[in-house]
């Protein structure tokens, strides 16, 4: 929130004193991305001796904009992002490293590179979560348990036919095992058939319809239908066809 001209003079004084990194924080997480990006660009264009230092971003997530602001920063002249695994930090947290890394990877047009081994992101997230006793929310981008889980019937059918329909990231790229088809009352026949095939059951249409009717009854009574439920369902309906 500091006046740009005053901030530029402060940066010049820091460079004159030998600073090689100029960290520009949004400590309260107040800035909008276009505002933060414009501030970084102003400094890149107006600070004398800026070529001697690296502009760095340090954004907080009070309004959920830490990652967006950080990307706006490096899109306008910053060359360093201060971030944390899982976005842990004061109050609502800081910029999440895993989000920044995958944005840069998925958007080559940004002209940026991190050098981070993305296949270790999920493992590292779990390690930090364990060491800090801080649970990662299930719907956390990139590393959450539901990041690659699909429970809606339409989405499940699309992912089964072509993963890229609903996933812009291959789970293996971030060290996740695979996409997850979660069977619930919202799942369709395609999802049920897919899961049954994974378990070794290949049902013709009439048998699948019968299994699906039983599945819906089961799904209405519990939050999720797991593999053991499906084994029992197949046996109870005498639909065993294993290959």
PLM region spans:
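Short secondary-structure capping/turn micro-motifs that flank functional sites
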Residues: 1, 30-31, 89-90, 145, ...
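Alpha/beta enzyme core
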Residues: 1-53, 71-78
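Active-site-proximal loop/turn and secondary-structure-junction residues that shape catalytic pockets
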Residues: 1-2, 26-30, 59-65, 85-89
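Short secondary-structure transition/capping segments
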Residues: 4-7, 34-36, 92-96, 149, ...
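Predominant activation on well-ordered alpha-helical scaffold segments within soluble catalytic domains
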Residues: 8-12, 37-44, 68-75, 82, ...
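Hydrophobic faces of well-ordered beta-strands that scaffold small-molecule active sites
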Residues: 22-24, 53-59, 81-83, 100
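Flexible glycine/proline-rich, aromatic-decorated loop/lid segments
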Residues: 65-81, 88-103, 148-171
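A mid-to-C-terminal "edge-of-domain" accessory segment
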Residues: 102, 109-243
